[in-house]
UniProtKB/Swiss-Prot annotation:
Name of this protein: Small ribosomal subunit protein uS12
Alphabetical keyword list: Antibiotic resistance, Methylation, Ribonucleoprotein, Ribosomal protein, RNA-binding, rRNA-binding, tRNA-binding
Effect annotated for changing K88E: Streptomycin resistant mutant. Increases antibiotic production
GO BP: any one term: response to antibiotic
GO cellular component: ribosome; small ribosomal subunit
Role, per record: With S4 and S5 plays an important role in translational accuracy.
């Protein structure tokens, strides 16, 4: 516990909150160009081939972004929209690609949670 004199001299220091999506620079989304599309394996208890893409954003920063949903049409030089949101079992992946916008197509035959995957309503 500090003395009053110590508080007069130094004062309390505010806690600094760490930014979870620094590459977006305060924007809700950012456009970018895919430089590499590949698959990675998740951390220990899980096993899969997760689809990810290396994306160069308009802010000039290159990030790794997850491609959600089943199947995708992305390849090198595809223009994508990136949002924040990490993937818990992929270390270093702190961004997600928005399906159904720019060059990214929505998920086919999606019945539930369609808006998250850019899927149109079936007639």
């Amino acid at each position: 516990m500090p003395t009053i004199q110590q508080l007069v001299r130094k004062g309390r220091q505010d806690k600094v909150e760490k930014n979870k999506t620094p590459a977006l620079e305060g924007s809700p989304q950012r456009r970018g160009v895919c430089t590499r599309v590949f698959t990675t394996t998740p951390k220990k208890p899980n096993s899969a081939l997760r689809k990810v893409a290396r994306v160069r954003l308009t802010s000039g920063i290159e990030v790794t972004a997850y491609i959600p949903g089943e199947g995708h049409n992305l390849q090198e030089h595809s223009i994508v929209l990136v949002r924040g949101g990490r993937v818990k079992d992929l270390p270093g992946v702190r961004y997600k690609i928005i399906r159904g916008s720019l060059d990214t197509q929505g998920v086919k035959n999606r019945k539930q949670a369609r808006s998250r995957y850019g899927a149109k309503k079936e007639k």
